[in-house]
Regions:
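Hydrophobic alpha-helical segments and helix pairs
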Residues: 1-33
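Beta-propeller blade signature
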Residues: 114-119, 166-181
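Short loop/turn segments that connect beta-strands within beta-propeller blades
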Residues: 27-31, 70-75, 116-121, 180-181
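A short beta-strand motif characteristic of beta-propeller blades
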Residues: 32-39, 75-83, 125-133
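Short loop/turn segments immediately following the C-termini of beta-strands
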Residues: 18-20, 28, 61-63, 105-107, ...
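Beta-rich, blade/repeat-based domains predominating
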Residues: 1-14, 40-56, 60-64, 84-104, ...
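Active-site/pore-lining binding-face segments in mid-to-C-terminal subdomains
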Residues: 82, 90-128
Length: 181
């Protein structure tokens, strides 16, 4: 099941398979997929974002926290953080300068945080909570950064699907929220 994807400046597409844990690279010119990180490293890769130079890919593993993948050789390093900063349950991941903006819908209460990266990008040095436990939240997920603002879906209703993948009648319309960064 292909999940999140990101397009690099050279039009290479990176995407995750949230069921097998594989990270793929898709060459637009060759129209072919190749494996960057095979199954066994990630449990449920979700959010993806490139570093400023496009040489590393930050991967949010819903169960395993944050990782940094060196794109040249596929080497994976776990991003460390102080015990006081939780990096689990991240669904959406975005970059704003030297911060990773993360939607955490796998922990309670749901929240949106900005995680400050070290200069080498391999550790979290601090965090800011941008939004937490808002009344509009019903599985917040997916967003985008425009300038110094973060727009995201506050109520994906992801947990409302029944076992046949149907949504019940009467759900509220999607709510898009904007947060200053």
């Amino acid at each position: 099941v292909l999940g999140d994807l990101i397009i690099a400046d050279d039009d290479t597409i990176y995407t995750t398979d949230s069921l097998t844990g594989v990270l793929y690279r898709y060459s637009v010119s060759d129209k072919e997929f190749s494996v960057v990180v095979d199954s066994g490293t990630f449990v449920s890769p979700q959010g993806l974002v490139l570093d400023v130079g496009g040489k590393h890919l930050f991967v949010a593993d819903y169960v395993g926290g944050l990782h940094c993948v060196r794109l040249a050789d596929g080497r994976v390093e776990r991003i460390t953080s102080p015990d006081s900063i939780n990096t689990y349950g991240i669904d959406g991941l975005y970059r704003h300068g030297n911060e990773l903006v993360a939607i955490q819908n796998g922990i309670q209460p749901h929240r949106v945080v900005a995680l400050a990266l070290s200069d080498d990008g391999l550790s979290i040095t601090g965090s800011r909570t941008l939004a937490r436990n808002l009344p509009e939240f019903d599985e917040p997920t997916l967003g985008t950064i425009v300038g110094d603002s973060f727009y995201f879906v506050a109520n994906s209703h992801w947990n409302s699907f029944d076992r046949n993948n149907n949504l019940p009648d009467g759900l509220s319309n999607p709510i898009i929220l904007k947060l200053p960064l």
